[in-house]
């Protein structure tokens, strides 16, 4: 299994364990029993998680945090379907603001492990 496949599997498990798909569907006003758009929504959730990880946000360690969840959902709402361009622009602006807050907050950063440390 390649690193990318392993990472995708890990993210998909995270999505299932935390009910992010269910939450995203609820926020998009899609009934939970409908599965027609699940692949698209899951892809967007995965993209949001990867974007957060790209800027060194510890998503896995803070996945239950409402700011992290909100940031993921805003990303999904900004990129889902072909909705109102003004709303999409507003969601993207909010996403970038949240991303910046998470990126520069020490609390949400991945902890670096010093391999040279004595313990």
Residue ranges and their predicted role:
Residues 1-68, 101-119:
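Conserved short "hinge" loops at termini or chain/domain junctions
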Residues 59-84:
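Mid-chain, well-packed structural core segment of small domains
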